[in-house]
Amino acid sequence: MKSTLSYLLIICSLFTACIGHQEESLLFYVDTRTGTAPSATHTAELFGKNTEEYGQTLPAVLEPNGMNFWTPQTQDTEAKCKAPYYYKDTKIQGFRNSHWIVGGCTQDYGSMTLMPVSGTLKYLPQDRGSLFSHQEETATPAYYSVLLKDYSIFAEMTGRSRSAIFRFTYNQPEDAYLIVNPNSDEGKGYIEIDTIKKQIRGYNPVHRIYQGWGEPAGYNGYFIIEYQNEIEEYGTFRHDSLFAGQRQIADGTGIGAYLRFKIHSEGPILIKAASSFTDMEGAQKNLDTEIPHWDFDRTRQELNSIWEQRLSQVTVQTNNRNDKEKFYGALYRASFLPRTFNDVDGRYPSFSTGHPFRQSANGRNYYEDYSMWDTYRALHPLVNILTPKKAGDMMQSLVDKYEQGGWLPIFPCWNSYTAAMIGDHCISALGDAYIKGIRNFDINKACEGMLRNAFRTPATYEEYKNGMGRRALNSYLKYGYIPLEDSVPEAFHTCEQVSRTLEYAYDDFVLAQVLQKLETSDDYFPDPQKTGLYDTLMIRARYYRNVINPSTGYAQGRYADGSFLTDAGNAFSFTRFITEGAPCHYTSVSYTHLRAHETSAHL
């Protein structure tokens, strides 16, 4: 009874604090769980059964554009289209340093999960999951807490970009365990227990999807866990086999480690964690720099202040609380990606290969995970307005990828080429930033990469297959559109020829504006090869007209001989020549009207 009352007092005090300050703190307009439940929209019913009907968001604790998204876990996989947490799930399996591409349908990578349990040792995620109630969750950008009912453990989490601190209050201190496991679906990874340093260390190898599916990405997600308490028992496990007293284990399905703490009275214990994409030393330095102490409330206040500053960049002039919740919740979700990829000392793995390690210059961050087809229209322009310096660092990171990999990426994720989705929208993002006055990136090197993508195709098939270069560029240049005969086989989204044509036309327009701006700018580095390219690109910017069927007024598939597809009933039907939609409808991108650079054509 005493224990139950203590938890109720903790929860009530937190709730009272929220009520007392809800008009002072913008954080209380943000429920980080929004988007984790299935959508009830008509679009969701038509498209993406069992995957994209979810918002695919996370109730994460993070710094804006931080490395890790610290999230409760209800799904024990890094598989494609499986977010770590779904609102409808009934059991929490632990707390993860997720690198999920929020809002998308890709994969998590390089993550680990830790979980406090009590009583009988249960270590596999599907066995150790605890019932919980959404009424007993607190989910803000800077703090998450929940009562794990099966164990009577009150779990709290806060953190920084690369690190986190947890406070677990055990009701059964004589059987207080901590479970840690790398989340490798490929059965790879390593974990070790260091009882002298009071640490658990390990790594989870990163693997690619889309181009190079299943291949190693060339680097690992390293992690380090630190604890203060003495322990009475430790060991490792692999799937359903437990190895008491063993300090390390490598590879195999479902590996991990466990500790049993030596505590004999009620009260919280503290756990710290950090990660790195370079090495274990990087993870240690990240932890020592970001959370060099054991003060949970201090870290929480630091992250609170960071989010107050972020959210207060925009003032919503309304007394409608629902509108404020929608807006500030959206601003929170617009602060996930791209993510910081470097350690506090500036080191990060090379783009595309993982090695050698690179060093970001002048104290800037190197960013990764650009879901570019989804973000070039609105997210990156928003970053340009709210945080122009960060926007420039994000653009320089794209330039770095070009210099390290040889081609400007199409859809850079998990620090690799992917050729996922369509378009060539790093051009759009770079051009938009430069035209709008962002100057803290190398525009001449960026222009070199943009021109390479716009006019050249990789010399070898292996490079192209690996995701380098614009898809179907040769067809686009030959016909002025991508004909239906070109199925675009070396892409995750094959076909979609009309959508690609429309997207490329806009990219070419943006590149033309950059060239025109550079000719009258102090940034311009004279290059005879650029002469006349503006006119060429402006002609290509009108290629979108080549896939508008004059007899219907809609975008339509076109053959190499110039004839249009004759299916007159396809304007509102899903079709392979349009990306995730139909030529003209209200449930997806209305590609017929994707010509933002010629708005007069809509009239």
What residue spans do the PLM features occupy?
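Bacterial Sec-dependent N-terminal signal peptides
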Residues: 1-23
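Accessory carbohydrate-recognition regions in carbohydrate-active enzymes
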Residues: 21-380, 384-428, 434-502, 506-520, ...
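Cytosolic catalytic cores of cyclic-nucleotide second-messenger enzymes
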Residues: 603
